[in-house]
């Protein structure tokens, strides 16, 4: 079986989807499923490069497509129009048994429509309101794939509401490398960790505001690349500077980090905080739990499917710095409870979200799709 995973951006671009695609491709290849990757040619800051190339990463063939038009609207996941994909790259698709599209960029599905191969659209975050309002985008979503993979049960309901048949939708949760993301060493008391794109939707500003309501001196580590909203990023840097000048807490922004550096902070942190306004099924929460780090997060997207309230973490309402502060204070004052939550979180991830278990399910999906369709 030969699989081509197609995604707008790929490693070394850092992000939840990019990490997921890379881990799946590596693990599938280890298990004897030949898997390669096709993506637009972007630098680490997602700026387009105008020339294509083919390279080997982790033993995987990566086809880099010239990014001839990269015009995001509403979200980095939904582009304005369809980016041009040269014919020589589309011809490459004929060499694979299944074309597995990641994210909701329609460039590759649109230009690959004539290729008679089984196709999957794998959504890592649904923008239900966008597709409900934009009829052409909704039409494309419904007709450019034979199967749809969603990462949360909530997302499955949203796809069905957009008119996609339930028997074409498969729920496959995100995964984590539980060998890499594993507990190690001692936790550092009062060390909080935020990992994610520095965007308004992730709610980092809420976390920074919450520190004013916490008694103990906090050390907050912030990791993640800036979003396209430069103003928000600059405001965050200003908030960090002002909080550090107050002297009651310490905040460090470290930028984007690769997995080998990132895991060290998960292992050290007392708590992982994600006060998002909206999510798909955040890999960062799985990474934290795999390292036995309890999570405080908001009940948005697929998060309630991961976090069992008061068992593996605490769920708090969005846009509520005081409520967040109370949850942080409660867990910092209860070390035994933190450790118990951490152990339960690791058990949960090992059972349901290890990369090995998820890849077994994905292989079964591939086999069923091939058996159900006849393609010449």
Kindly label every feature range from the protein language model.
Residues 277:
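Aromatic "clamp/platform" in nucleotide-sugar-dependent glycosyltransferases that forms part
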Residues 49, 221-248, 260-261, 337:
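Short, structured helix-loop element that forms part of the nucleotide-activated donor/catalytic region
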Residues 19, 190, 197-213, 234, ...:
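A conserved mid-protein helix/loop that constitutes part of the nucleotide-sugar donor-binding site
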Residues 309-310, 314-321, 330-335:
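Conserved acidic donor-binding segment of nucleotide-sugar-dependent glycosyltransferases
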Residues 294-297:
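Short hydrophobic beta-strand element within catalytic cores of glycosyltransferases
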Residues 101-107, 123:
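Short His-centered aromatic/hydrophobic patch
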Residues 256, 264-269:
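Short alpha-helical donor nucleotide-sugar binding micro-motif in glycosyltransferases
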Residues 154, 175:
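Carbohydrate-associated surface elements
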């Amino acid at each position: 079986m030969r699989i081509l995973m197609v995604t707008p951006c790929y490693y070394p671009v850092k992000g939840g989807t990019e990490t997921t695609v890379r881990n799946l491709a590596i693990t599938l290849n280890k298990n004897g499923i030949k898997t390669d990757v096709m993506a637009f040619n972007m630098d680490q800051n997602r700026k387009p490069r105008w020339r294509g190339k083919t390279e080997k990463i982790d033993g995987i063939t990566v086809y880099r497509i010239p990014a001839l038009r990269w015009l995001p609207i509403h979200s980095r996941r939904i582009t304005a129009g369809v980016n041009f994909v040269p014919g020589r790259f589309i011809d490459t698709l004929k060499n694979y048994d299944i074309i597995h599209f990641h994210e909701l960029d329609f460039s590759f599905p649109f230009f690959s429509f004539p290729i008679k191969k089984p196709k999957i659209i794998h959504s890592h975050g649904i923008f239900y309101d966008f597709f409900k309002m934009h009829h052409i985008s909704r039409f494309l979503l419904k007709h450019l794939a034979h199967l749809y993979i969603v990462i949360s049960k909530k997302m499955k309901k949203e796809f069905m509401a957009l008119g996609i048949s339930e028997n074409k939708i498969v729920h496959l949760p995100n995964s984590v490398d539980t060998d890499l993301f594993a507990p190690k060493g001692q936790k550092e008391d009062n060390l909080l960790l935020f990992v994610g794109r520095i965007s308004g939707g992730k709610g980092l500003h809420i976390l920074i505001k919450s520190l004013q309501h916490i008694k103990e001196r906090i050390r907050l580590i912030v990791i993640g690349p800036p979003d396209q909203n430069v103003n928000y990023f600059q405001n965050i840097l200003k908030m960090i500077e002002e909080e550090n000048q107050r002297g009651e807490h310490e905040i460090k922004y470290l930028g984007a980090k690769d997995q080998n550096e990132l895991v060290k902070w998960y292992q050290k942190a007392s708590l992982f905080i994600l006060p998002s306004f909206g999510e798909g099924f955040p890999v960062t929460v799985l990474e934290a739990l795999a390292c036995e780090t309890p999570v405080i997060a908001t009940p948005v997207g697929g998060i309630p499917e991961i976090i069992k309230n008061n068992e593996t973490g605490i769920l708090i309402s969005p846009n509520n710095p005081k409520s967040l502060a109370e949850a942080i204070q409660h867990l910092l004052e209860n070390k035994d409870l933190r450790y118990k939550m951490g152990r339960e979180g690791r058990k949960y991830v090992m059972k349901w979200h290890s990369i090995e278990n998820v890849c077994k399910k994905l292989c079964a999906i591939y086999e069923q799709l091939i058996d159900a369709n006849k393609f010449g």
